[in-house]
Amino acid sequence: MASSSPLVDLVQLIARSLVDQPDQVVVREVPGDRFPRIELTVAREDIGKVIGKDGRTAQSIRTVLNAAASKAGRRAHLDILD
């Protein structure tokens, strides 16, 4: 089993704590042109829990992700896939 990046682990931990079906959470890192994209996929019925009212939960996850990436001298972008 390949080890995942700390950013992937962080998003996975946050997402699994928010959803009703944590076993359906899939997080992967995709190389980008300037910085990596972190792709988050959850069960269809949990997508609203991850996005939140007016996108506030998603924005909060992105803020934590960017803070962690910045501390490591990196940048990252979170995509929530449906």
Roles of regions detected by a PLM:
Residues 1-49, 60-82:
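RNA-contacting regions in translation and RNA-metabolism proteins
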Residues 51-55:
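Glycine-centered tight-turn and secondary-structure capping sites
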